[in-house]
Amino acid sequence: MKETLARTDFRLPGQKAVYHGKVRDVYTLENDLLVMIATDRISAFDVVLPAGIPYKGQVLNQIAAHYLDATRDIVPNWKIATPDPMVTIGHRCEPFKVEMVIRGYITGSAWRAYAAGERVLCGLPLPEGMRENQRFEHPIITPTTKADEGHDENISRQEIIAQGLVSKEDYEQIERYTYALFERGTQMAAEKGLILVDTKYEFGKKDGKIYLIDEIHTPDSSRYFYAEGYQERFERGEAQKQLSKEFVRQWLIENGFQGKPGQQIPKMTEAYCDSVSERYIELYERVVGKPFEKADLSNLAERIEKNITEYLR
């Protein structure tokens, strides 16, 4: 089997803390620096799956870095450097306790709720007669609370402000940033023959200033459809050809797993993991518009620790 990076346990210069998220390992250093390592872990339905996906961490880290650089004129972001294909180092910000999900089309969990009869999503009324994968007249923001453990919950703009999760002034600013980032992401995707269907952004504050943090426009935080054939598939009521993690979710559903108690995660064979890896690489090449350069997979953890340590010297 190809080597994958499941988890890191480094002792980095100036290290104060480490947090192992669903797919990232995040080290807090002195001087308000963060080291974010995109591992090859993969999660779906808020569960980390048992097998790693070769090159997934590199794909996520490099797509995010590409888009952070391409949107810096819209909003300041946390990224300072990428000393390794799987690592980003940046400013530690105090994250807002909400994630800004923005949708240009009705699909995924929003469609599942709509199909079950719900007509209000995060406080927003939805029109009757919508069909799966239909474009909204205007993109809609459907925020979620940010859960450290377990499931993120939908929440409305009014509730966020009323509960004091984010001040009204800050919320209005991150809302403006969210629309502007989605517009830029939509334009950049269109140039590559893709539709940015929906995505999520996270923001934080440092020294009173709002920053875009974490990853953006990656297959883990976004859905992309192929633009070619979208309309025909939509009119025929067929599934869209998409580049996202949705194909993993669909495979799990078909194999009887949706993250519910008592359900068993199906066995992920080496061939299956390789096929997921190929989808991620294809996504990188489509989204970034450049060939993917596979980093050496031997001694991954050693290489990463060396590159981080050399950068921090």
From Swiss-Prot:
Quote a single Gene Ontology cellular component term.
cytoplasm
Q: Which reaction does it catalyse?
A: 5-amino-1-(5-phospho-D-ribosyl)imidazole-4-carboxylate + L-aspartate + ATP = (2S)-2-[5-amino-1-(5-phospho-beta-D-ribosyl)imidazole-4-carboxamido]succinate + ADP + phosphate + 2 H(+)
Q: Which residues form the signal peptide?
A: none
Q: Name one GO molecular function term.
A: phosphoribosylaminoimidazolesuccinocarboxamide synthase activity
Q: Keywords for this entry? A: ATP-binding, Ligase, Nucleotide-binding, Purine biosynthesis
Q: Which GO terms describe its biological process?
A: 'de novo' IMP biosynthetic process
Q: List the pathway annotation.
A: Purine metabolism; IMP biosynthesis via de novo pathway; 5-amino-1-(5-phospho-D-ribosyl)imidazole-4-carboxamide from 5-amino-1-(5-phospho-D-ribosyl)imidazole-4-carboxylate: step 1/2
Q: What is its EC number?
A: 6.3.2.6
Q: Which Pfam families match?
A: SAICAR_synt
Similarity comment: family membership = Belongs to the SAICAR synthetase family.
- What is this protein identified as? Phosphoribosylaminoimidazole-succinocarboxamide synthase
What lineage is this protein's organism placed in? Answer: Bacteria, Pseudomonadati, Bacteroidota, Bacteroidia, Bacteroidales
